[in-house]
């Protein structure tokens, strides 16, 4: 293990993330690169803090390099999210992929991934769906018929994402070893807290909830001191995400769309565009919108991502399947020479990358639009064009 990659959101960066970086150093990582969601996040929202703040927090805690997971690939299914992150880290030259998992051994995750990628899986899935099971349950049951034990692995959030990483490595033929790390302290997406090595830990979702209800100081027990200072400054400058502005912006933009426009979106179809069109005209808040769209068939996470795709006009066709560039958001100066060996266009300027060809321009423009939207949803609204003018963070 020499060059370790992590795919993360850092929404926000907290003490659990810092502990993970320390663990990797202790296990022999000489260089750590992070592929971080930018503009938007995988749950179909905007990050609580802007990219530069999260990048500085990660670098201060031990990361060597932070590259962007561009917005259209961040607001995506677990499969697409994982594929994009693996592609970027492999292109950067990482030899190991580290990730949190409830099952800290790679072999069971790899076996489940192989089953999901097998030629026999589509027929097995179809059989389970025809029995009336919802998609997630049908997928787990189908995987179980091909790989005993897979269904249990597909019940826990970190294992689910870990299996998607394994699938991406398998499909892309990426030369990366897997390093699952046990999730320490608080469980993913819960209000539980824990303590490891004398450090209080909480999930990112719990920290976001604390900040939204009690203010930025409430995050202090669960965030490294250096990061906390960055967060205080960001809060004072009005850079925190404002849920009410997000809600208003989403409904405002959705109400300008026609059913025809919505039908061209990524993830639309089967009448979803008509449901979205009708719900947007009745909903009073974005959470009300999600409730109106909800069905037993469609997971809430999928609907949240569809809503954000509609706001950002992400099309069903035209976007490259995988990110076509490596945009460095921040780095220790000693890590910058690694870019010379990248297998896809790499640099510190989005404008410079976008100008190289049409494919890069399309992806960059979609990313820039998402960053602009994110900055519209801050307590203090920021000017447009930030993605193209932002400076790399160097330490």
Tell where the protein language model's regions lie, with residue ranges:
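A broad structural signal for alpha-helix termini and local helix breaks/kinks
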Residues: 28, 62, 170-173
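N-terminal catalytic cores of NTP/NDP-binding nucleotidyl/phosphoryl-transfer enzymes
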Residues: 1-54
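Non-catalytic positions within long, well-ordered alpha-helices that form the structural scaffold/packing
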Residues: 25, 59, 89-90
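A glycine-rich helix N-cap at a beta->alpha junction
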Residues: 56-70
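Active-site cores that bind ATP or allylic diphosphates and position pyrophosphate for catalysis
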Residues: 68-395
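Receiver (REC) domain switch/active-site residues of two-component response regulators
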Residues: 30, 64, 95
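Short, contiguous strand/loop micro-motifs
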Residues: 7-8, 41-42, 58, 72-73, ...
């Amino acid at each position: 293990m020499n060059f370790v990659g992590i795919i993360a959101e850092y929404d926000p960066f907290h003490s659990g993330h810092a502990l993970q970086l320390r663990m990797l150093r202790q296990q022999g990582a000489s260089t750590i690169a992070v592929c971080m969601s930018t503009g938007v996040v995988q749950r179909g929202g905007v990050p609580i803090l802007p990219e530069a703040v999260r990048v500085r927090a990660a670098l201060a805690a031990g990361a060597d390099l932070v590259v962007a997971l561009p917005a259209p690939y961040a607001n995506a299914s677990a499969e697409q999210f994982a594929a994009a992150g693996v592609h970027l880290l492999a292109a950067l030259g990482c030899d190991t992929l580290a990730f949190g998992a409830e099952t800290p051994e790679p072999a069971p995750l790899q076996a489940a991934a192989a089953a999901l990628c097998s030629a026999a899986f589509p027929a097995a899935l179809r059989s389970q769906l025809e029995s009336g099971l919802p998609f997630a349950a049908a997928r787990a049951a189908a995987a179980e018929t091909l790989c005993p034990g897979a269904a249990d692995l597909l019940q826990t959030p970190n294992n689910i994402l870990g299996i998607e990483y394994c699938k991406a490595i398998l499909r892309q033929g990426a030369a990366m070893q897997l390093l699952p790390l046990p999730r320490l302290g608080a469980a993913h997406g819960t209000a539980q807290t824990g303590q490891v090595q004398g450090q209080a830990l909480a999930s990112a979702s719990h920290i976001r909830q604390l900040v939204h209800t009690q203010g930025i100081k409430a995050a202090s027990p669960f965030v490294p001191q250096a990061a906390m200072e960055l967060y205080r400054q960001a809060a004072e400058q009005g850079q925190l995400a404002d849920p009410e502005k997000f809600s208003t912006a989403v409904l405002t933009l959705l109400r300008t769309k026609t059913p025809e426009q919505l039908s061209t979106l990524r993830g639309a179809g089967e009448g979803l565009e008509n449901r979205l069109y009708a719900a947007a005209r009745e909903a009073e808040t974005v959470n009300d919108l999600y409730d109106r769209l909800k069905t037993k068939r469609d997971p809430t996470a999928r609907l949240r991502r569809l809503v954000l795709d509609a706001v950002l006009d992400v099309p069903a066709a035209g976007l490259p399947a995988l990110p076509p560039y490596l945009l460095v958001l921040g780095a220790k100066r000693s890590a910058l020479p690694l870019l010379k060996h990248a297998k896809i266009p790499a640099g510190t300027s989005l404008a410079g990358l976008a100008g190289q060809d049409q494919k890069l321009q399309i992806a960059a423009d979609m990313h820039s639009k998402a960053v602009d939207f994110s900055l519209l949803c801050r307590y203090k609204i920021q000017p447009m064009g930030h993605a193209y003018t932002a400076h790399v963070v160097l330490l």
